[in-house]
Amino acid sequence: MIRNFNTQVGGVEFEFMTQHVIKLHGFQVYVMHEAVKIRFHMQVNKKGNFLITDRNSCPAPYLEFEPYLSEAILNSQKKAE
């Protein structure tokens, strides 16, 4: 079962909400930016990495965190097994 989780990257707290409880496929990601809770989506690609699906919906300072957020998703699910 795929689980929701929180993690910190670069001192910033990210909340991951799964969009599929059986298959590791996509997440809604929430982050506080300038006192506003922002949502963007990450989805798995053919190589098994998670990418931000709409880079315009993710605050620019966090775009560089994409590989770390992908790694956090993969590691969180290994821990849940």
Give the location of each predicted region.
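Negatively charged, low-complexity tracts enriched in Asp/Glu with abundant Ser/Thr
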Residues: 1-22
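Exposed beta-strand and adjacent loop surfaces of beta-rich binding modules
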Residues: 2-4, 26, 39
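Intrinsic-disorder/low-complexity loop/linker signature
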Residues: 9-11, 35, 48
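A short, sequence-level motif marking secondary-structure junctions
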Residues: 18-24, 43-48
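Short, surface-exposed, low-complexity cationic segments
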Residues: 22-34
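Acidic, low-complexity intrinsically disordered segments
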Residues: 37-81
